[in-house]
Amino acid sequence: MNISDEMNCWANFPAMVGYAAAHEALAEECMELAHAALKIARCLRGDNPVGSPILSYYSKMKEEYTDVVSCAIALGLQPNADISVWKWERHKKRLEEMEGK
């Protein structure tokens, strides 16, 4: 993940709005990202039409992802490689077990 140094401008956000509000902003942006991803999934499946082309939702998803990362920067959150690898291995094992059935 390549996060530009310019995005560190968000580091002062909690001091400006308070930590509770910064966490609320993260929660809201996560929900908006999830909503955009669900719209894309519906477009890809072709069921339950969403009314707009997939590219508009892809643009929205990129915007919301940037908002989530901005809030994470504000709260000093960073990805944890150990957790990520552990979760990938667990997920991969489940998929392999499903294929074997």
Positions of the model-derived regions?
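Flexible "arm" and connector segments at domain edges
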Residues: 1-101
